[in-house]
């Protein structure tokens, strides 16, 4: 109870007191309660927003409140909270939008390396850049793998030889490199033609969903997850990173997560595409 009443920075200092304090402060339930009860300065503890200036879109991460001082040795960058607007804006046009999973936020500025922000502990992790020059042009999937008990980033793109390839990065691995994935079985289920994934992704219950445009404007909703789905193409793969489902639907608009609060592994969730004339709703379920 006392720890919950401490300001965020003072509470984090207590992590060094003992292993018991460390376990309590790092537990998801404590972080959730602290965020809910924290009303310091009347500001939200973690807020990601954007504003338009000329033709560019600028993202500001309010919870960082300072500039990042990066070093070659540091994998995790500590973020001070003394200044609100000193963090440089992230300028982007259309390639990538920030996405979140389990309280973590993944963002990237065009061809630069991605960053994962932890607003509760005020830490930033720089993700290594990928070797293929075409990889950064496609969005990243970001979600929690319950089997591996870690967050993973997945990247799927098409090479100049029109081959669909994928790489995975695990935040909990000691090896800080992207791993190549064999998605030949998943790629064979896709219609023939050029594949372009949108930057609109959401994560619900172990799935990462995003839209893909194939050849002459035909669109579908693709997902990578740890469970199979009731509709669409079902591919029998056991690994979270290798399961891909394609929904053959003509879509338009933006992929939006309605709500993920209180979802369990057996829950169904609604994904909605808001188009100019109608709404498309998908109900993925566990089977």
Curated annotation (Swiss-Prot):
SUPFAM superfamilies: F-box domain (SSF81383). InterPro entries: F-box-assoc_interact_dom (IPR017451), F-box-like_dom_sf (IPR036047), F-box_dom (IPR001810). It comes from the Eukaryota. Residues 1-36 form the F-box domain. NCBIfam families: F_box_assoc_1. This is F-box protein At5g48550. It comes from Arabidopsis thaliana. The lineage of its organism: Eukaryota, Viridiplantae, Streptophyta, Embryophyta, Tracheophyta.
């Amino acid at each position: 109870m006392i720890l919950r009443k401490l300001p965020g920075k003072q509470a984090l200092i207590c992590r060094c007191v003992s292993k018991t304090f460390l376990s309590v402060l790092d537990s998801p339930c404590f972080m959730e309660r602290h965020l809910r009860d924290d009303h310091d300065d009347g500001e939200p503890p973690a807020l990601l927003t954007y504003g338009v200036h000329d033709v560019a879109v600028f993202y500001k991460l309010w919870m960082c409140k300072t500039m990042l001082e990066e070093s070659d040795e540091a994998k995790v960058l500590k973020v001070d909270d003394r200044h609100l607007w000193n963090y440089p804006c992230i300028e982007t046009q259309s390639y990538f939008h920030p996405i979140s999973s389990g309280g973590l936020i993944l963002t990237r500025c065009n061809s630069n390396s991605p960053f994962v922000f932890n607003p509760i502990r005020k830490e930033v992790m720089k993700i290594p850049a990928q070797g293929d020059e075409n990889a950064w042009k496609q969005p990243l999937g970001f979600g929690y793998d319950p089997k591996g008990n870690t967050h993973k980033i997945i990247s799927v793109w098409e090479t100049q030889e029109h081959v669909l390839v994928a790489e995975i990065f695990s935040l909990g691995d000691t090896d800080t490199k992207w791993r190549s994935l064999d998605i030949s079985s998943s790629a064979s289920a896709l219609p023939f033609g050029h594949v372009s994934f949108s930057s609109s992704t959401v994560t619900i219950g172990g799935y990462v969903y995003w839209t893909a445009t194939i050849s002459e404007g035909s669109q579908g909703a693709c997902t990578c997850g740890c469970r199979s789905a009731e509709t669409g193409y079902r591919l029998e793969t056991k690994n979270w990173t290798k399961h891909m489902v394609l929904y053959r639907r003509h879509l338009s608009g933006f992929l939006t997560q309605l709500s993920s609060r209180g979802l369990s592994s057996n829950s169904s969730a609604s994904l909605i595409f808001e188009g100019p004339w109608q709404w498309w709703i998908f109900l993925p379920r566990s089977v």
